[in-house]
Amino acid sequence: MPDTLELEVATPERELVREQVTEVQVPAAQGYLGVLPGHAPLLGLLGIGTLTYMVGGNKRHISVHGGFLEVLEDHVRVLADVAERAEEIDIQRAKAALERSQREALNPALGVDPAEALAATMRAEARLATADKK
């Protein structure tokens, strides 16, 4: 069994990661999934949260929002709708987005779909949680 697996994280705009890692934790649609080398193959939906991976004993973090996940014995491919490395996240912008989405969720008169407001809140919270891990 291999000691590492190749991790690829990409969005429609860019590739964020392509490197050998020892472990990956991915926010899947039904909760977090831990992947080690030799994992059983699977396809899944990506959730909203922090993708964490280990390289040389160091943890690295990426905020991901929606997309797809493919796991093979020696490879993890994440195709995210949106992804940002922890160090790329603009904390002030994420805080402003969180405040705006919470305001929209609590005020139906603003005309924002409650499901959209909730999703925006979850995305902003995930970005802030990821940024906090850098």
UniProtKB/Swiss-Prot annotation:
Q: Which InterPro entries match?
A: ATP_synth_F1_dsu/esu (IPR001469), ATP_synth_F1_dsu/esu_N (IPR020546), ATPsynth_dsu/esu_N (IPR036771)
- GO cellular component, as recorded: plasma membrane; proton-transporting ATP synthase complex
What is the predominant subcellular site recorded for this chain? membrane
Q: Name one Pfam family in it.
A: ATP-synt_DE_N
Keyword hit for Mitochondrion: no
Localization recorded for this chain is: Cell inner membrane
Q: What topology does the record note for this protein and the membrane? A: Peripheral membrane protein
Is this entry keyworded Mitochondrion? no
SUPFAM superfamilies attached here? Epsilon subunit of F1F0-ATP synthase N-terminal domain (SSF51344)
Keywords for the protein's UniProt record, in alphabetical order: ATP synthesis, Cell inner membrane, Cell membrane, CF(1), Hydrogen ion transport, Ion transport, Membrane, Transport
What binding partners and quaternary form does the record give? F-type ATPases have 2 components, CF(1) - the catalytic core - and CF(0) - the membrane proton channel. CF(1) has five subunits: alpha(3), beta(3), gamma(1), delta(1), epsilon(1). CF(0) has three main subunits: a, b and c.
Family statement: Belongs to the ATPase epsilon chain family.
Task: Report the function annotation for this chain.
Answer: Produces ATP from ADP in the presence of a proton gradient across the membrane.
Protein name as annotated? ATP synthase epsilon chain
Taxonomic source organism: Solibacter usitatus (strain Ellin6076)
Q: Source gene?
A: atpC
